[in-house]
């Protein structure tokens, strides 16, 4: 099985590759279109701003490929957020693959932002098989509200989507590569059981 991490020039590429390699999945980091087209599974990581991520994808001529791929793709953190229509972060249009808008967390007394740390995630979807009541590691200031495409939810000052899915596109707001055993199980589920 060919597993490719789409090279978005963001900071967490190496840690995701290390996690995949440690699990025995030989992953490649690439932005080469021919190589990406040969993938069985794709990962779209992201750290930073939606504007920066979209600029990089445009610069690397990856937007059309991502929008048209039929291969299972997992967006991670910002990679999930840019699967939507629009991010309120610097008012940025995104990939328009799943119908949602990324919004800033609502301020609430007793909560600090960015949301950083371990939170329980609730889901009965196959992506979360064996992960009932599992905790995952989050680092984000913007979130996706609950909606039609939510497959897992979480709460921190408000309820939000911990994971979304439409067709072959999946997204997780947390960092599975930094979420210990729970993250490893989720990555294995995506590679072995999805698509």
UniProtKB/Swiss-Prot annotation:
Covalent S-S links between cysteines: none
Localization (cell): Cytoplasm
Known catalytic reactions: 5-[(5-phospho-1-deoxy-D-ribulos-1-ylimino)methylamino]-1-(5-phospho-beta-D-ribosyl)imidazole-4-carboxamide + L-glutamine = D-erythro-1-(imidazol-4-yl)glycerol 3-phosphate + 5-amino-1-(5-phospho-beta-D-ribosyl)imidazole-4-carboxamide + L-glutamate + H(+); L-glutamine + H2O = L-glutamate + NH4(+)
Primary location class: cytoplasm
Gene3D superfamilies referenced in this protein's UniProt entry, alphabetically: 3.40.50.880
Pfam families named among the record's database cross-references: GATase
Active site annotation, chain numbering: 77 (nucleophile), 175, 177
Single GO MF annotation: imidazoleglycerol-phosphate synthase activity
Pathway(s) annotated for this protein in UniProt: Amino-acid biosynthesis; L-histidine biosynthesis; L-histidine from 5-phospho-alpha-D-ribose 1-diphosphate: step 5/9
Oligomer status and interactors: Heterodimer of HisH and HisF.
Name under which the protein is recorded: Imidazole glycerol phosphate synthase subunit HisH 2
Classification lineage: Bacteria, Pseudomonadati, Campylobacterota, Epsilonproteobacteria, Campylobacterales
